[in-house]
Amino acid sequence: MTATVHQAFADTAARHGGQPILCILPETAQAYDIVAGELTYAAAADAIETLRAAYADAGYGHGHRAGLLLENRPAFFLHWFALNALGVSVVPINPDLRAAELEYLAGHSEIALAVALPGRHADLLAAAQRAGRELRVMKPDDAPPAAPFPAPLQGTALSELTECALLYTSGTTGRPKGCILPNRYFLHAGGWYARIGGLAALRPGQERMLTPLPLVHMNAMAYSAMAMVLTGGCLIPLDRFHPRSWWDSVRESRATVLHYLGVMPAILMKAEPTPQDLQPAIRFGFGAGVDRKLHAPFEARFGFPLLEAWAMTETGAGAVIIANHEPRHVGTSSFGSEEADVQVRIVTDAGEPAAIGEPGELLVRHAGEDPRYGFFAGYLKDKAATDEAWEGGWFHTGDIVRRESDGALRFVDRKKNVIRRSGENISAVEVESVLMQHPLVKAVAVAAVPDPVRGDEVLACVVPEAPPADADAMAEAARSIVQWSLSQLAYYKAPGYVAFVDSLPLTTTNKIQRGEMKALAPGLPGTARCVDTCHLKKRPAEGAHR
């Protein structure tokens, strides 16, 4: 039985040695200043064994943790698998982290080693010193320095329950939590993807999966990487999403599968149509959060399905759900229905089962004897948060969904993103989706601001396509945006305030940092670049929609 990620890789390398495991496109190679081309399983296996032996000689072993600040480079995979063979857990480090964040990570994770790009060595060493930790730092091509302390679990056998990685949540609110992910988490994620079939069926030894998503998050690291390892496929990691060259990269890479974030289809659809839009080689896209109004038009224009899925870092594939069978309910934020090995409850704020069509919090667990099978093993140094998340034997996701009469699940919003105005629950994501269709809007984030009468009012932070020239132009732009939303949404969902900003607080995966938005929003009304549009929000006359 395969017990570790390294063993899974070695098994595939023995069968598919001549096949490529990685493809680095020239654009990515130029961004990273590395060599473009393909790396075979056999060549990767040789490099990994060399690294494994070097790490072992330097004293690294079971129970150590090693940070990887390597972006989406091939070195990430080679060092990950080599360290995994010894029982060393890897801690992917977001390259955008700075002093305070690195100090927290170094202290909280207790990494013994950081394999990092040379330009970040000083930052990491300074962060570790402030955290009171002894840390070794090396470049990916260096010989490993001696371990600063003995392996904590030296002599203990490796298993599928051995910690494989420590992934930190994106930290959209509060301090990031360290999710302990065992080997089983990654093996189950790749195995799930390899077997789900339907529109997401992976053909052994034939798929070429392109992803611009960062390896510091589970989508690329657990689903994409492990699915390719377990099926003998080729992963094509990009340094990031480049809208202008995206389709050139798709064609040049000979990709058959794409992974996407919800923001990507919206950006790609803004480009002028061309005769090259149809992508016959692409079998499907895997992702989440595509704009409802763009879902069907995107598929018609580019010629492949976008399969919406739901999962979290904490759930892994222990409770993943995907719309990989028809009917997919395109354009409704549907992510399909659960398989037999996943159990789902949807509950109201009172903890009662939600009725069909009624929004409620999604609770999940794995079916069978172990409800946590395939999930994370817990939050590092935070048993209370782990227990709270698993209250009542169900994992509380914090996502608001609803189940339709045919069993399909539809995403509404994150629980903490819901705006409550005059007793009405308003989804920030829903409002953002509509506002993004306005030609003046380049990017938008919606948040609540206090209202003495209604409890909350809706505020939209808009990054305009072109900054308004003066106060009058700003007021007119705000009026146009609100009138558009009034034509698309119930009146109470339209923005009561429109603030024009230069940029939005985003995570590295281009998700809105809701914690920062929550803190930022209340201070915007009354400022020069925020237009009060509350007077435009009027309930339609009774006969207006008849």
Language-model features: locations:
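Structural core segment of the AMP-binding/adenylate-forming
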Residues: 7-10, 57-58, 81, 85-146, ...
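Gly/Ser/Thr-rich phosphate-binding loop
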Residues: 230, 255-260, 269-329, 343, ...
